[in-house]
Amino acid sequence: MKKLLITLLIVASIVACGSQQSQKRDSLQRVVVEPAQYGYVVKNVYPHSTKSYTQGLQFVNGVLWEGTGEWGKSVLQKVDLESGKCEVLARLPKSEFGEGITVLGDKVYQLTWTNNVAHVYDLKGKLIKNERYSGEGWGLTTDGKMLYMSDGSTYIYKVNPETFKREGKITVTLRGHAIEYINELEWIEGKIWANVYTTHEILIINPETGVVEGVVSFANLLKEEDTTADTDVFNGIAYDKEQKRIFVTGKNWNKLYEVEIIKR
């Protein structure tokens, strides 16, 4: 899915960010900040279903929620952390490609890629309603009040959870340059953590300004011996705010990792 072209474009974008020393001022008056650089240490490893094309991941009240993609295979499910066993709560229509999810209060929200519809469920997976939106749906998270949504562009939109209307947006910038292909999102300690599609990097973003304040590299997380022909890109961020645990995985990966972030 759109992977090769996007990878080439992302590489070009990141190279430009690293090599240019200055840029002309634009109408956004972007703030140039040198982001902190982080690596990781694996704390625990858990099984993950290789049938789960992970699009969204969230850990809430001891429950790991996962939304998966692919035409005809997209689901909303709960995952037992220790065993990796999946309990499918809802299956999307075969005409829909599932994307990001988030849990807010007693509702679960799930985006679709190109169908312009978000499904809203109760905590048992019963469909409550559908909400329409323009453009593509990619990542979704919440600060506990509002939703934050990505569409693969440089923007993250602030969305009203009751009406699904956009009430604002930020442009994600790295060293003053707008970064595209913002994908899976997670709200962690007042910041938006976002995967850049097809890369092993997560950006730590100021939700007010869009400025990238940190970059976490997850290079070499999945070992070659753990890959198969179906193994796809790094994707999926979840945060257990009670125990301060961070979980990451990828599409059709056989492992889900609990990681500690280490500043370089």
Residue map of PLM features:
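Conserved beta-strand positions in repeat-built beta-propeller and related beta-rich domains
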Residues: 66-70, 108-115, 149-153, 194-198, ...
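C-terminal motif of bacterial Sec signal peptides marking the signal peptidase cleavage site
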Residues: 13-16
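Beta-strand-rich domains and repeat architectures in extracellular enzymes and scaffolds
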Residues: 43-75, 90-102, 138-139, 250-256
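A short helix->beta-strand "capping" segment at the edge of beta-propeller domains
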Residues: 30-51, 81-87
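Short loop/turn segments that connect beta-strands within beta-propeller blades
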Residues: 79-84, 122-126, 160-164, 206-210, ...
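Bacterial signal peptide processing site
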Residues: 18-21
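Beta-rich, blade/repeat-based domains predominating
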Residues: 50-60, 94-104, 133-144, 150, ...
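A short beta-strand motif characteristic of beta-propeller blades
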Residues: 42-47, 85-91, 125-131, 168-177, ...
